[in-house]
Amino acid sequence: MFQKRVVVIVGFIAIIFFVIIIRLFALQVINNSYYRIQARKYATRIELIADPRGKILDRNGNVLVTNRLAFDLFVTPALYFKSKSNKPKSSATLQVNPTATKEVDYFADQDSDQWEIIRRLANLMKVKTDDIASKMKTIQQKILSQSETKPERERKRFIKQQYRNRYKIFSGLTLAQAVQVESHPELFAGFNVAETISRNYIYNDLACHIIGYTGPIWKEEYDQFVENGYFDDMLNPEIDENTYQALIDMGGFKNAFLGRSGIEKIHNGLLTGRYGVRMSEFDFATKQKDELSRTESIPPTDIMLTIDLDLQKKLEAALKGKSAGAGIVIDVHTGEILAMASAPSFNPNLLQPPVDSQMTEFISKSPLKPLYNRAISGEYPPGSVFKMVTALAALEEGKITAYTPFYCNGHFSPQYKKFKCWIAEHNREHGSLSLEDAFKGSCNVYFYNAGKLAGGDAITRWARNMGFGERTGIDVSGEKKGRVPKLPVDNDALVASISGTNSANLKTSKSTWALSDTLNMSIGQGDLIVTPLQIVRMVAAIANGGTLVRPRIIKSNIHTPHPSSPLRGEEPGEGDNSLGGSAVLIPSAQAVTKVNISAGTLT
């Protein structure tokens, strides 16, 4: 009997050992590669290597935008939860019971060492403890939520891995705050500081609509960027697909900054360069990090603008305090923008981390629209400045000469009583006028007559020849194209040829064009809207004798650009470089130029 019991016990022990041996064999031989990969994943960190963003300078080399050293605060949850009296919570954080992961509150005990760390940090950062706890909870909940999609055997490992990653919770620490955290790891367990680069707009709001601003990647657009391959364009081409995918999986680009408007946006690729990658192993016991491999970054490009700093200052001073307005100074021969401003302005430094949420909301939602670049995005009826196009059309069509007279008694005709000259408001008249006199007095009646002779078709055609109704192609994002009316086929000629027709029968509609529409357009009113930049371009073409230049804001790239496409956003449009396919209009554009100079309207 005793011997039988011994045999049973020995057999039972043998079975246990056999099971253990089989399990060890499975771990060390069959699943060796799987666990080796997993172990390496948990111990390996992949980090982006980024160069400071390229500078932006004016045409004379004055630095407008550079970079300054900044500090970000990161937390490594695994190290944070290992602080002293948290062992019950530490083990709880790694539970994989599906019913428990959503219910455990690791911050309920405000007497724990974790809460003491949070209190110290809140005091240092001058924020509420709840603000930090909320950020920590968000990280924790996201990890637990993601773990639920993993197979049961991988969940615990996944949570451990994610807890060993670093997560940014604050940007824009002062040097004193950064030194305090780094100098006392025992007081701020799990938290560390990383140097980063923040944009520095030296002259605050100066040229803000040209330069634009940078900002973080929004949560709602991150997945879209991944899907469209934006981040692949931001890496050194030598970095392989596996490393890129690992970066995507770990959210390696979520802390990246990119251009949000202006030059910062349209030339984001040049200003950013291309990221490199550093792969290292981190020992959680010793907290030592050993570099395994490195692929260097590709340096960014500095960009020189065409604007002149002193001229820009003077233009912005003229617009200071205005609720709305725009101004542009252009080289009429080259198309270089020497100054461009829009009012009201904004300070892009206020949109850099740490971002004041109230200030951001004010800037983005203010009814004054300070982010709106009225110089290239504002669309308005051009008014009297469009009279130059009317004159050009009438001259080019051979309907008038510079000396053709029209008589202004204050009104166009008895049938069109509402079409009157501004001087009629003062019970006066201009009398007989030449083209030069008409420009001097900005006489509506003269241009009503010139427009009627030229016809709506000719005026709209020459408006398009002068660049209206299309983007100029300036190398800044956000340009609008305005609108030039489209005439029904043959309708204008028909209506304009009818003499003595009652104005009630000439009302415009979607399918008809009336003489009243031609009259309105002749003085820059009606269904015609343009941007300030289009007006400046038109005036430049008349001033230089007929060449329609393409406005540009980039003078040169200081460094040889690398073969990189910018992070795709809104690309500059294409603009024509000539009037109606011909670079010079002779003699009409020159005639209008001479008349305007003589009249004093182009001086």
Language-model region placement:
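Short coil/loop residues immediately preceding or within conserved phosphate-binding loops
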Residues: 51, 302, 324, 371, ...
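Glycine-biased, low-complexity coil/linker segments
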Residues: 568-574
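Conserved, well-ordered alpha-helix/loop/beta-strand core segments that scaffold catalytic motifs
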Residues: 285-325
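Solvent-exposed, polar/charged alpha-helical surfaces in well-ordered, non-transmembrane soluble domains
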Residues: 71, 115-119, 123, 171, ...
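Membrane-proximal periplasmic segments of bacterial cell-envelope enzymes
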Residues: 1-288, 295, 321-326, 332, ...
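Beta-lactam-recognizing serine transpeptidase/beta-lactamase-like catalytic domain environment
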Residues: 65, 71, 95, 282-297, ...
